[in-house]
Amino acid sequence: MEEERIYTIPLRDVTNKSPTTKRAPRAMRAIRDFLKKHMKSDIVKLDNSINEKVWERSLNKIPAKVRVKVVKEGDVVKATLIE
């Protein structure tokens, strides 16, 4: 059974609570943790487009939020960026 959802993931907490040199890696981790929590699965695969969006303006200027489309197939969760 396939389940599909659209989420807006806030990254403002990552910006406020992280040093500038660690924001992008922590944002990627925050996205993965958000999807694990909301989709109730441990296996989360992020599309390269999400990575490019977070790293687009370098290490320390991450976006405030990211909109993703999430598809759950069995136990695997796959996320892609919505433009």
Curated annotation (Swiss-Prot):
Domain of life per record: Archaea
One Pfam match: Ribosomal_L31e
GO molecular function: structural constituent of ribosome
Any one annotated GO CC term: cytosolic large ribosomal subunit
SMART domains listed in its UniProt record: Ribosomal_L31e (SM01380)
Record's keyword annotation contains Transmembrane: no
SUPFAM superfamilies in UniProt: Ribosomal protein L31e
Any one GO BP annotation for this protein: cytoplasmic translation
UniProt keyword list: Ribonucleoprotein, Ribosomal protein
InterPro entries in the record: Ribosomal_eL31, Ribosomal_eL31_CS, Ribosomal_eL31_dom_sf
Record family assignment: Belongs to the eukaryotic ribosomal protein eL31 family.
NCBIfam families in the cross-refs: PRK01192.1-1
Protein's recorded name: Large ribosomal subunit protein eL31
